[in-house]
């Protein structure tokens, strides 16, 4: 089948089987075109909870599918490609977290949503990149242990000087490697462009940005801005999607290394096989993890998503 024929068959099957397809913004344009909803990890899970579909296919990475299952326990949830994991989410395990918490008694533990469900069972609340500042501000705690990304944690801490922060030294392997030198090169090549950066980037990069925000925030800003050129400091799929959505504007990658191969694992054939029942992985979680991680995620929703 051609790409178009495969897309049409996927659209037919998802309707026939009453399945909702969710695609993270870092997926390919071809995958986004068959999705019912696109966005960031938390936004997709919220949409999954709202849909009337009996089943959900997550085109993203494992922690996203797990979050979706926790927020929609009555639905059947599949991860389209079972090999798609998030390196940052897998950097810290439970024994290491417990040891870290022992070093910081009296600290509230705040987990980035990019963590495993097992890890969330030991945390007080989780956050997204767009909600981290507001939730940490609202949290009834003066001391916060922020895991696993010190870049996002430092960005939050800089805006909340009244609170004391400690960090685990993990982070996104892609965003972490971008440097001030990359910014200098991109600015020199595109002097009229605005720089839009994800807070998973290092502080030396964030400090030079015209806008700092989540994937969804970056896309919304670029679409509304009067500027005509943008340097995109997050996963390079966003350059592709913004170029598709805003053909009258120009978008440039901040650095070629901002490509997440884990997010590129999911393909149209994966989704097709999932709908046929011959591929993908149905997500199941033990009852204690569903309950513990659910408490952590629900508190995030209560404090403002």
Predicted features by range, described:
Residues 1-232, 238-305:
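Active-site loop-to-helix "anion-binding N-cap" substructures in soluble metabolic enzymes
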